[in-house]
Amino acid sequence: MIRSLRKMLLVACLAAPSVLPAQVCLVSKGKPQARIVLAQDNDVNRKAAQLLQRFVRETSGGELPIVANGRRSKNCVVIGESTDEATDDGYVIDCSRGTLAIKTAGDKGAIYGVVALLEKQLGVDYLAKDFYTLTPSADVRIPQMHVAESPAFRFRQTFSYSNNDSTYRDWMRLQEHREMFAADMWVHTFDRLLPSSVYGKSHPEYYSFINGERRPGNHSQWCLTNPDIFEIVAHRIDSIFKANPDQNMISVSQNDGNDTYCQCPECRKVNEYEGSPAGCYVRFLNRLAERFPDKHFSTLAYLFTMHPPKHVKPLPNVNIMLCDIDTKREVPLTDNESGRDFLRALEGWAKISNNIFVWDYGINFDNVVAPFPNFHILKKNIQLFKRNHATMLFEQVNGTLGTDFAELRAYMLGKLMWNPELDADSLMQRFMRGYYGAASPYLYRYQQMLTGALLASGTPLWIYDSPITHKNGMLNANLRKAYNELFDEAEKAVAADSAMLAHVRIARLPLRYSELEIARTESGGDKAAVEKSLDTFGTICAQYGVPTLNERNNKVEDYCRLYRQRFLPNGTKNKAAGAKVIWNIPPQERYQPIADKALTDGLYGGTTFVESWVGWQGEDADFVLDMGEQKQVNKITTDFLHQLGQWILQPKSVAYYASDDAKNFRLLGTHEFPEDRDISVKFVPATVTLAAPVQARYIRVVVKTLGLCPSWHYGVGYPAWFFLDEVVVE
């Protein structure tokens, strides 16, 4: 276990040589002076007692005995008495008359009370998985006090690899959805409750009507006005609750995917009356809530259901899980238009419900190992949620090891979800002092510079962002040089402490990754320097076990391998380099400004579709490359992107033609694409190799679209995208 023991001056109440009447002495000169008494011997109280026992021992060397169902006495710690001074998960710490009592308002209140005592009185900070700091002292004395605390939100969750450490999870006062939702049914549950694999063929009428026909599939939605669905779903829910008698909440919520709601005449009528597709959903959930009045039902307000209905109101036991997925993150939600659109939805739901679960995003799905400086908005957004009747909060953030300051972000969110009035900057500095030690001033300066540069640039921060988006802003060359100088100093400051050095090197990975991503977009760079940077990045990731680079679990080792193959010069000469493009069917309008150059500029696109790629949606591509003169053609390859989460699928086929006059073309060959359901982001080459070389000046490329997204895809029934960048003629 990694531990860091920091010797620091103790506050007077811990260092006093004698015990004042109002104090409780737990340990004196390393010898236990008190015992821990369980008011009730249950799992929560015993865990709280063991937590206190452990850290008192590690701080002082003295181990307090634990007594079940013992009597109150002088100099004892009583854990688990009930209190009505706090709400669920809340606690009271009362030190008076020679007794220290940690009282609970229910659930894990006793554990959280012990955590508060250890933090505020013993100086223990549990900062990440298996990592904590404490203040050694042979004497532990608790002053007179009476403190009552309740959480701002009754449910608090965030992603973090540290959550695998149960002590950390309790310390951050975090919960897991499986603790509350029956059968782990907490989001996107439609296909689990009414499986399209079971009912799709025999009852397509149960599923969304989109673009002229029913579209059953595991990402399709339900036809919520169909009278037969309700009883099937109600029966299924009844069986789930009976199998999980200790849980009384379930999610009945739309499958993932946008605009896939039913548009049959009956559903359309309800949607038009309610002013939102959410109308059908709330009506359906209300019926379930009436059928099971002692249960609680959660449903999503997400993408097409984000805005509330005009007329129907959720019943009290219907929970609205409201998601702000489409908002930008460079400023608080109140300060940009995407945020204000979400705020209108939040305020609308708050007018008709006091039972709101906010799902907030602080993640870059496409590049989790990239800078994402959103720390300055965390507090304001959480306060906003609280003001608008949110009682439950999930913060979806970059939580895997190696992602951008994952440990700091999880720590700050845990603290702010419990108490949004805490000072965010103080939290950041406290964490950094404990987790980065002597390197903390440099990393704090880095975060301040990065945030300032982001705001000064005016560039939005997006959940599908790329470092390349910011290469002229917060990641410009001069700033990257300054950031690296700070990290150099940070590494020097902790060079003798292997644990701290590991923390600093992991924190530097997003900067290293950004430099690699930016380097591949700039021609004429130093190949040897880039190779060295790539080796360093891969080595550090392997050394510390960094598992992935994006939401789709693309591995670091694959990234490094593909980078060498794809982005570093390999001697291949493209005879179509710089060719003029003649469009028969041009790309979507937003991609036309880059299209003339992007297909033959020698710069390959990365895993994020927003840079270098050229896209078509729901239609074919047809264009001609004018190479300027007759050239020998042996092989043609076009590069395609595969990214299912963005509706980017491989097309049906690509055909290549050759011509001498741009009028009469002869077919050279066709590449057919197999169906690919792999969720990984990848690059797919479409190559045709000729049996014998031909002479040609013009190369025509015709790509046949897949058409509509298939039944298994998020965009079922809607036009699919395909993206390509380089066309290479050899």
Enumerate the predicted regions with their spans.
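Structured mid-domain segments that build the active-site/substrate or prosthetic-cofactor binding neighborhood
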Residues: 228-229, 340-439, 445
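Feature activates predominantly on carbohydrate-active enzymes
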Residues: 32-33, 43, 48-51, 55, ...
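Short, well-ordered secondary-structure micro-motifs within conserved domains or adaptor modules
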Residues: 65-87
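Acidic, His- and aromatic-enriched active-site or binding-groove loops in soluble protein domains
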Residues: 270-288, 316-335, 415-422
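Substrate-binding cleft/loops of secretory-pathway carbohydrate-active enzymes
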Residues: 298, 302-326, 369-374, 402-410
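Aromatic, loop-rich ligand-recognition surfaces of beta-strand-rich domains
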Residues: 605-669, 684-730
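Bacterial Sec-dependent N-terminal signal peptides
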Residues: 1-25
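Catalytic domains of carbohydrate-active enzymes that cleave complex glycans
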Residues: 416-597
